[in-house]
């Protein structure tokens, strides 16, 4: 059974002005998502600025999220690293805290071979024990998981069960689905490609959009799963201007501004990320207004 179906939020991490984690606002965000249609919380991923967290902060954030979610919706922890040993340690600790799964990005910078990725993910999955969601995002990592690599892992490692696909390579994704024969749960990693990915057998999305429009992201997925493909596509297309505004600069710069504009939490970013440019802020504000998120 899938860890979740629908829209999981790639949740932002609220920081105070001094850049410490704002756990009070994170608690409020967790309640917001549990009450507004989000199907899963994915903590400490790209949108959560995990790359600029210490390992101690990372694990404290995971532990807090599991405790505060209280089983209302599944929690998936980003525990990826380009160091296999570190990824193993983070994944095991997250599993000990009670996460429902871990999200594991391909080893970045090292540019591992396909053989190296198989070794990496096999070792990490063995340490984690909980379900593993692979994360293919070559635009950030510098390496791509081939369909055959994904199929080998899914077919040989019992707890590697899903993939977040942000490559945009639909031919490779289709091949993955063919080679795994129903054993791979596919999630879109791109909000503007939810419906296309679901047409290949996808279960939903791990979403930036969900940070500000959780019901819309959920509805795009659920309508498709209910066989209402036209309605799903219509909502996907309606959301495109907002989605594009959320990616005017590198994620999570725009979405951090968006949650600030909605009053959900502060927009503080950790360096080297910098505040959204004023002209982009105005575009974002306009699209949020058009979508009914702010006045």
Give the label of every model feature segment.
Residues 23, 27-30, 147, 281-288:
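Short, amphipathic alpha-helical "lid/cap" segments that border enzyme active or binding sites
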Residues 136-137, 159-160, 270-271:
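Glycine-rich phosphate-binding "P-loop"
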Residues 72-73, 131, 160, 183, ...:
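Secondary-structure boundary/capping positions in well-ordered alpha/beta enzyme cores
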Residues 2-9, 13-142, 152, 294:
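Active-site beta->alpha loop and helix N-cap motifs at the rims of alpha/beta catalytic domains
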Residues 6-14, 36-38, 199-200, 206-295:
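C-terminal alpha-helical cap/extension of soluble enzyme domains
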Residues 83, 190-191, 277:
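Helix N-cap/beta->alpha junction signal
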Residues 26, 58, 62, 87, ...:
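A general structural signal for well-ordered alpha-helical segments in protein cores
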Residues 126-127, 140-247:
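Catalytic alpha/beta core domains of metabolic enzymes, predominantly
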């Amino acid at each position: 059974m899938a860890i979740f179906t629908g829209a999981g939020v790639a949740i932002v991490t609220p920081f105070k002005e001094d850049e410490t984690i704002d756990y009070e606002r994170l608690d409020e965000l967790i309640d917001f998502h549990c009450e507004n249609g989000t199907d899963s919380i994915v903590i400490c991923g790209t949108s959560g600025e995990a790359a600029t967290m210490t390992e101690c902060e990372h694990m404290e954030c995971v532990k807090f999220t599991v405790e505060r979610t209280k089983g209302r919706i599944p929690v998936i922890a980003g525990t990826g690293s380009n160091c296999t040993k570190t990824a193993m340690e983070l994944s095991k600790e997250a599993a000990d805290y009670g996460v429902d799964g871990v999200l594991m990005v391909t080893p970045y910078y090292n540019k591992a071979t396909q053989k190296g990725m198989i070794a990496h993910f096999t070792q990490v999955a063995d340490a984690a024990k909980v379900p593993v969601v692979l994360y293919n995002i070559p635009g950030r990592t510098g390496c791509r998981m081939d369909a055959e690599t994904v199929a080998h892992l899914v077919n040989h490692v019992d707890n590697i069960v899903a993939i977040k696909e942000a490559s945009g390579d639909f031919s490779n994704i289709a091949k993955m689905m063919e080679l795994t024969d129903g054993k791979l749960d596919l999630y879109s990693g791109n909000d503007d490609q939810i419906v296309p990915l679901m047409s290949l057998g996808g279960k939903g999305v791990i979403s930036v959009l969900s940070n500000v429009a959780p019901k819309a992201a959920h509805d795009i997925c659920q309508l498709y799963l209910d066989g209402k493909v036209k309605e799903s596509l219509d909502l996907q297309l309606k959301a495109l201007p907002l989605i594009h505004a959320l990616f005017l600069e590198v994620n999570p710069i725009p979405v951090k501004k968006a949650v600030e504009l909605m009053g959900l939490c502060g927009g503080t970013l950790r360096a080297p990320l910098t505040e959204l440019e004023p002209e982009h802020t105005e575009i974002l504000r306009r699209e949020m207004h058009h979508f009914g998120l702010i006045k």
